[in-house]
């Protein structure tokens, strides 16, 4: 079968990430022909479309790109990248893949065909014996919904943030100056930083996503701390026991760090049981091979 994998940014940052989806698509390439394109590029009539995007993009500056893919006559699935949901945003997609149970139940309530497909690149993110030199780490684009300012308030210069600076959302960068900050780095470097950390502290808010950050920490057997108002991350910690949930304030975060620091974690076993790139690929293939 022929597949058009569509993502705005596929010609740049997608390859830089080498995340679970990148690795999942490499598995799919072993069985099918895959072409990686931007949403404004031509899609062939015989291609099955996999489109990675937030549905709310339809109302933003790139809305015309979203609508163009949405209106294609091809068989197509949306790989939902997070954010709010409205039923009409999903019209004309044959299926929607989500990253966890929270979003699946949201879409079920809207009577939208959906299933879970998600995971990490377990070949890059794995436990390594390293000296722990960082109290807390977080990898995420600097954005209001990631709350890097809260991370910096809780950890100060004992915390390390790593992510892309956004000119259009400068507050997260300006508010986090007390922490040590790094630009977006290749996956291999991020894995080294996770393994050098006592904890991963994911301060993402309700709409903040951050599930990849949570699962990559678990893949490295590093305790992850997530916020109680971030249900998409809470579900992974609750199911795995590989971390702790705390309230989104500096004192609660510091207390949580003390509770889990130095404890043996079972995150890697949890990842290998259901959240590897192979699991990710197999779930995508269920749609592709029945399209």
Predicted regions and their residues:
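Acidic anion/phosphate-binding donor-loop and adjacent secondary structure
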Residues: 87, 107-114, 118-134
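Conserved catalytic-core segment of nucleotide-activated headgroup transferases in glycan assembly
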Residues: 14-21, 122, 131-187
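Acidic donor-binding loop of glycosyltransferase active sites
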Residues: 195-209, 222
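N-terminal pre-catalytic "stem/leader" segment of glycosyltransferase-like enzymes
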Residues: 1-65, 282
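Short alpha-helical segment that forms part of, or immediately flanks, the ligand-binding pocket
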Residues: 191, 214-219, 234
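A charged, aromatic-enriched C-terminal amphipathic alpha-helix characteristic of glycosyltransferases
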Residues: 247-248, 258-290
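Short hydrophobic beta-strand element within catalytic cores of glycosyltransferases
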Residues: 223-228
